[in-house]
Amino acid sequence: MFDPTKLSECDVAEFIPHRDPMILISQLLEYSQDSLLTQTDLSTASPYFDPRLNGVPNYVGIEYMAQSIAALAGVEAHLRNDIIRVGFLLGSRKLKMHISQFKLGQSYQTKVTRLYQEESGLAVFDCQILHNQEVVAEANVNVFQPQDTQAYIADAAQ
């Protein structure tokens, strides 16, 4: 049986639909109802690492937020004994990047908190990326998770 108090021992890939090399978050740290804290550890092997910046460009932070939201959905799916579903990043509001890059050798925590969710799968999350307890990026992120991804994609293609 899944124990959310032992998230830090779990493989991130068990909770999100992404696969390497596109898994950007390193660890799930803490779950509470409607909220998840994750960690991203930066190395030269990190996706989007730019040696000219000696880090990852700040705009990748929106994907750290989106993958943390996906991981929250994955934790909730595990708690329901449900499958991991694909979701879609629709956009963001109030996006503020307080740093120009995520630096090599540093760890960043991403906290996502659900503000609103409709039965249709549309949701809004408050997201913050922290470094040493300081907010370095923040946004309200809009996402959509259809109940049947294949049917949704087929309908959208018509």
Q: What do these predicted ranges mean?
A:
Residues M1-D11:
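Single-stranded RNA-binding regions, centering on S1/OB-family and related RNA-binding modules
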Residues E9-R19:
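Short aromatic-glycine motifs in intrinsically disordered, low-complexity regions
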Residues T5, A71-Q109:
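Hydrophobic beta-strand-centered segment that forms part of the acyl-chain substrate-binding groove
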Residues L53-L72, V86-G87:
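Compact, glycine-rich, soluble single-domain proteins
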Residues D20-P57:
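Catalytic strand-loop segment that frames the active site of acyl-thioester-processing enzymes
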